[in-house]
Amino acid sequence: MSPLLRRLLLAVLLQLAPAQAPVSQPDAPGHQKKVVSWIDVYARATCQPREVVVPLNMELMGTVAKQLVPSCVTVQRCGGCCPDDGLECVPTGQHQVRMQILMIQYPSSQLGEMSLEEHSQCECRPKKRESAVKPDRASTPHHRPQPRSVPGWDPAPGAPSPADITHPTPAPGPSAHAAPSAASALTPGPATAAADAAASSVVKGGA
């Protein structure tokens, strides 16, 4: 056998070896487990129109129908993953599709038509950020705060409000250096007591 033929036979055996290897599957013996390739997983998850189930009560806000048959329909809407967290899958092409829906309202029912939106093209675009507009303090006029209302206050016409009523400031109390009171003025001091004693002794000596 020539070396070239040996190499070809070895290559064929290497290719057939993984396919002939036994696969252990307790739940399904004799069946090889199917693995979805990465390219298929990525293609299925990309941003594209896909069939989704939409409840009719969310599409028809304010409908008087008591019951809709069917209660939900399938339409093509954009969905899927974007390569960046700052992007979102949004529709770039849409059209209207009309469907027949049975509207039941006791005791009668009728077959009607309704228009639903379907997406035909999708694209990943930056997410819309809600800009928080803060008012400029310099441009905002300053308003004087209004006085708080007093419970039970019923002002008469022309009467001042409780916030406009001013109370007199109480006079300051006596200080430490204030003049002595009347009681302390009547109390004799040491010099006065000595003069009174001398006067009484003179009176006694003269007697």
Swiss-Prot record:
Gene source species: Bos taurus
UniProt feature, compositional bias: Low complexity: 174-201
Range of residues in the leader sequence: 1-21
GO molecular function terms noted in the UniProt entry: chemoattractant activity; growth factor activity; heparin binding; vascular endothelial growth factor receptor binding
GO biological process: induction of positive chemotaxis; positive regulation of cell division; positive regulation of mast cell chemotaxis; response to hypoxia; sprouting angiogenesis; vascular endothelial growth factor receptor signaling pathway; vascular endothelial growth factor signaling pathway
Record flagged with keyword Secreted: yes
InterPro entries xref list: Cystine-knot_cytokine (IPR029034), PD_growth_factor_CS (IPR023581), PDGF/VEGF_dom (IPR000072), PDGF/VEGF_growth_factor (IPR050507)
GO cellular component: extracellular space; membrane
Gene: VEGFB
Coiled coil: none
Disulfide bonds: 47-89, 78-122, 82-124
Family, similarity comment: Belongs to the PDGF/VEGF growth factor family.
Subcellular location: Secreted
Protein name in the entry: Vascular endothelial growth factor B
Subunit organization: Homodimer; disulfide-linked. Can also form heterodimer with VEGF.
